[in-house]
């Protein structure tokens, strides 16, 4: 008996604390049960029954049958006055039970259902069967700006935006409220759930979505692992769907090592059968923003970053680009590597001594250099580098030779790295920066990438006066707000250019990812041109439809996709180097030949930075002797001739 009581109580409590329909089911079950008991008991009493004569009479009242009389008493107490005197005590019992069940419990349950519905909506517990919607999994500082971009982009129309997060729904709505107007705010749906549960992920209806952004939560220690695990579960859901198109998935990886692994190896090959997989990294994203798209924000608050080659580095030019990065933080390394992909110019084809230079300054440069050389070991197998110790009064220089190759097989790259150990605020390094400013042979840019934003601000504003007097661009990393630097670098037409007009903020946490797909489309077009040229021997005269570009793109390995993307990123610097700044024009044969050599130099750097290595002489013989061996070396050993 006790067991049955416990089971009944447990089931009752679970039902009444759950969804509203369960409460209604219980209530109607009780009502039906009570009414059936009343109906059975009523047979102990004589109820007036209608006769055939009474049914056919026109002006006579027609008495109701037993069942209908009981129903009327049960739901309306006023009907008790019509009951014969000998039934009034029984009728009173029926009326009281009806009052309790209908006027008491039913109204309470319905009111509770409405209150619970409102509460569940506020807490983000209601699931809606959406379709053609945008899904954002996770919530951090960049999500409100991402939503703003989606709402401003006519490509997305007025589709709903579903946000799944473990954070309180009210907190999410309040943060989004500051970015959106009332009309777009109605498009937001918040669902409080975890991204490591298949059951919770199925509620997102990703198989019917238009696009998915897997961002993750803020301040997670195992952010990348959770995102990968979440993506695996979503792919499993899509595998079970027979008619599911390839939906774009943009996935944030916090650590550059994770991001680099997905750039080189086809870890996502199985996933890409069911989804369009697009990884991105916060630091790589900001490096691309300031070096490739060169724009942050829109409207009056738009910041346009100057190119590193703000002077055309032509074939005849004697100048080289010099990028100085203060602080070997993750942001600093990302900017340095992105710059190495871009800084390739025609004058190196004429004079092999004119190379682009990327200099890192850090008080722990000796240790950070070892990490950097280990991560990009295949670059340093070929290229030499300079290391300077300026941490003390005396300056010590060390020339580091290539670790594997020498002679004609070494130092043929057109970009070199330098490492300086010391603090940028010391007099020795301040004087060195002055020398660089007044060196007419270089085009200088400085990026301050310290981890502590106030320290970055101080460093960016207290460089030698020569930096500001000569209008050298200074990029200063910030995290939360760029308001002060936006005011300092204001260059409206009605204002004179002042001391800090060439100091630019970057690295804000709320704005990293750009929805602009221009570079991706350019990469797809480059791939199409390569394929067309290989198949037919000439260049296509027109661009195919987007679906044809996508189909060809999705067949590529990840490393080849990134190769085409980096080639697309370098289009603007290449065109500037031959004097073209406005639009696209037809090139002559000499320009094509020159840019092809520049592209080959860029391609060499790209392969080394992505993780491929140069083969030895013995390996080259095997590679060129057999196509099968060549494929093995490229795809399994990451050796590229």
Model-derived features: where do they sit?
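Cytosolic regulatory regions of ion transport systems
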Residues: 2-35, 45-65, 78-606, 615-641
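Extended, composition-driven regions rather than compact fold-specific motifs
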Residues: 40-44, 71
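Short amphipathic alpha-helical coupling elements at transmembrane boundaries
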Residues: 69-73, 152
